[in-house]
């Protein structure tokens, strides 16, 4: 493959065409069943209809989705709900014709609404989702699913019984770059996967401006254990899903540590965590996140016997780099001290320094939290599914396990012990089927 990113970057539509996902294709359905194409009849139905959406939770992530919905021709936002007036006012400016509510239950009573999208704080996800499904609505809920494993399981069970569509906001499942990366991994490009290292580093305090002290916990809910699980649910769940996706199996146990290392400002959730997930085949996924240094950013480093994949950077690297021709190879070997030095009285060795090869680009583009990370593709797929009434196979299962694994990681940190995946929270999927 030519090492030129501009030559391989594809438009999202061209990318999905390449994978056979548009126009009745199904090349990757066995590996990525949530990407199944619409039938010809489905496409006719989608072209003729609009799904009427009630949107619950109009803060920053909510408004991001609301802006994206404007670009989807078969999405019609007819109602908005938030119990924080400034956010509701901002959302109303985007959709001035939409009804407004300060109580989500009143929105659910509106029979004109076919589907709801939920972008509230984490502690509200479970009960709003369950109430919406009971009200006969299709549901899109932001990740993570819930604050407890029991609530995640309740959401899953109600969804399965409802006959409705449910999507969870795991956008990497629709990110063309990640899809292409997984196609390459599952085809054996990297050889046998033997380790995964994932991390997400930021440098900010997670605080939002508070107009009044009595609103501190409402606005800065991410910092308090009553409302938030911190880094494991806000960040880690994205990357845990990627690890499971790459290995096509689920870890059996987890150990971890966490502390408030830097932001000693009265917060209750950790600002630094380290986790180790152990898979049945012996592979470990290590995860680290902190919010006091952003130098390394975020990545999932998927390491195999033949190479390494970095899907967030859009690169993969082979272990054995093709040698440079002639004199350039000799110069490189001398400069990098490839030849062993034999000392007079001591061992002969060469340090295992990191590889300096530039790697090869993966097709597609991504930018976390912005257009191009799979978010708009995910919401588009939800709108299509809400019109046809056909759920995306295995999407909720992927989201369920990433949510529960994050919560088990937090339990391992809090209790200071290795946590084995509890049987009562296993649902039939992958190696837990």
Put a short name on every predicted segment.
Residues 1-11:
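N-terminal secretory signal peptides
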Residues 22-95, 175, 243:
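N-terminal Rossmann-like dinucleotide-binding module
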Residues 57, 61, 161-168, 172-267, ...:
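Predominantly a Rossmann-like dinucleotide-binding segment in NAD(P)-dependent oxidoreductases
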Residues 88, 370, 374-378, 405-416:
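Stable alpha-helical structural segments in soluble proteins, enriched in small hydrophobic residues
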Residues 99-103:
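Conserved SAM-binding strand-loop segment of SAM-dependent methyltransferases
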Residues 116-117:
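N-terminal Rossmann-like NAD(P) cofactor-binding module of classical short-chain dehydrogenase/reductase
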Residues 121-122, 126-174, 188:
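Beta-strand-loop-alpha-helix segment that lines the small-molecule cofactor/substrate pocket
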Residues 210-220, 231, 244-246, 253, ...:
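C-terminal glycine/acidic-rich active-site capping loop/insertion
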């Amino acid at each position: 493959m030519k090492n030129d990113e501009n030559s391989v970057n594809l438009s999202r539509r061209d990318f999905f065409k390449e994978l056979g996902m548009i126009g009745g294709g199904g090349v990757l359905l066995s590996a990525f069943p949530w990407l199944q194409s619409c039938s010809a009849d489905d496409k006719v139905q989608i072209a003729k209809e609009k799904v009427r959406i009630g949107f619950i939770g109009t803060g920053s992530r909510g408004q991001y989705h609301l802006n994206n919905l404007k670009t989807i021709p078969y999405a019609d936002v007819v109602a908005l709900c938030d119990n924080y007036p400034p956010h509701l006012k901002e959302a109303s400016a985007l959709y001035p014709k939409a009804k407004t509510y300060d109580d989500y239950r009143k929105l659910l009573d509106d029979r004109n609404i076919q589907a709801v999208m939920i972008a509230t704080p984490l502690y509200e996800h479970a009960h709003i989702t369950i109430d919406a499904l009971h009200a006969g609505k299709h549901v899109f809920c932001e990740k993570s699913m819930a604050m407890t494993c029991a609530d995640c399981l309740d959401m899953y069970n109600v969804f399965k019984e409802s006959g409705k569509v449910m999507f969870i906001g795991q956008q990497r499942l629709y990110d063309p770059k990640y899809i292409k990366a997984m196609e390459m991994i599952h085809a054996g490009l990297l050889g046998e996967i033997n380790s995964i290292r994932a991390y997400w580093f930021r440098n900010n305090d997670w605080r939002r401006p508070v107009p009044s002290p009595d609103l501190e916990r409402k606005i800065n809910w991410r910092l308090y254990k009553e409302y938030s699980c911190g880094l494991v649910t806000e960040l880690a769940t994205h990357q845990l899903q990627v690890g499971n996706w790459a290995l096509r199996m689920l870890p059996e146990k987890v150990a971890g540590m966490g502390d408030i290392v830097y932001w000693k400002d009265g917060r209750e959730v950790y600002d630094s965590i380290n986790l180790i997930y152990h898979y049945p085949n012996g592979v470990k996924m290590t995860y680290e996140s902190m919010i006091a240094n952003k130098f390394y950013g975020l990545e999932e480093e998927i390491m195999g016997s033949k190479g390494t994949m970095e899907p967030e950077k859009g690169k993969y690297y082979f272990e054995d780099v093709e040698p440079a021709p002639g004199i350039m190879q000799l110069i490189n070997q001398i400069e990098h001290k490839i030849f062993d030095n034999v000392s007079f009285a001591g061992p002969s060795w060469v340090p295992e320094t990191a590889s300096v090869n530039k790697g090869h680009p993966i097709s597609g583009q991504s930018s976390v939290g912005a257009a191009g990370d799979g978010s708009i593709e995910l919401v588009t797929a939800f709108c299509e599914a809400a019109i046809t009434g056909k759920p995306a196979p295995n999407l909720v299962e992927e989201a369920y396990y990433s949510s529960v694994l994050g919560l088990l990681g937090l339990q391992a940190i809090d209790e200071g012990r290795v946590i084995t995946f509890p049987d009562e929270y296993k649902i039939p999927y992958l190696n837990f089927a």
